[in-house]
Amino acid sequence: MAKKNAGQLKLQVPAGAATPSPPIGPALGQRGINIMEFCKAFNAATQEMEKGAPIPVVITYYQDKSFTFSLKTPPVSFFLKKEANLKSGSKEPGKVFVGTISRDKICSIAEAKMKDLNANNIEAAMRMIEGSARSMGLEVVG
């Protein structure tokens, strides 16, 4: 017999750093999900990833208090900041550029993010990522 789905919860958790403290603990606790069980499973699943990278996770929880979760790739902004060695984006994107990024780096980001983007091909994914780069104040070169 199939489990009754009680709902879904979307969180962004640093890789390998899930703890029962806020915001994770309260979000899971009010839905009756075992917090420590999730933290251990999440940390085990993300141990191969870069520590501290924000990982979007979709938690599906059931009426019997069990859960499953699926991991996504980190946000495009994380990859762009990492590739351009930035702390944050521009306060005035389009007017003030805080750095540059090459099309080769955008291509590598697009390949990494392809499974989470709703693009049909790599060129469309690259255009999406270029738009994100411009909105962060990065100049696309090459």
From Swiss-Prot:
Superkingdom of the organism of origin: Bacteria
Gene Ontology molecular function terms on file: large ribosomal subunit rRNA binding; structural constituent of ribosome
Keyword Ribosomal protein applies: yes
Post-translational modification: One or more lysine residues are methylated.
Gene3D superfamilies assigned to the protein according to its UniProt record, in alphabetical order: Ribosomal protein L11, C-terminal domain, Ribosomal protein L11/L12, N-terminal domain
GO BP, sorted A to Z: translation
Disulfide pairings: none
PROSITE patterns registered for this protein in UniProt: RIBOSOMAL_L11
Alphabetized UniProt keyword annotations: Methylation, Ribonucleoprotein, Ribosomal protein, RNA-binding, rRNA-binding
Gene Ontology, cellular component aspect: cytosolic large ribosomal subunit
Keyword hit for Metal-binding: no
Purpose: Forms part of the ribosomal stalk which helps the ribosome interact with GTP-bound translation factors.
Subunit structure: Part of the ribosomal stalk of the 50S ribosomal subunit. Interacts with L10 and the large rRNA to form the base of the stalk. L10 forms an elongated spine to which L12 dimers bind in a sequential fashion forming a multimeric L10(L12)X complex.
Family classification: Belongs to the universal ribosomal protein uL11 family.
UniProt name for this protein: Large ribosomal subunit protein uL11
Organism: Bartonella bacilliformis (strain ATCC 35685 / KC583 / Herrer 020/F12,63)
Phylogenetic lineage: Bacteria, Pseudomonadati, Pseudomonadota, Alphaproteobacteria, Hyphomicrobiales
Name of the gene: rplK
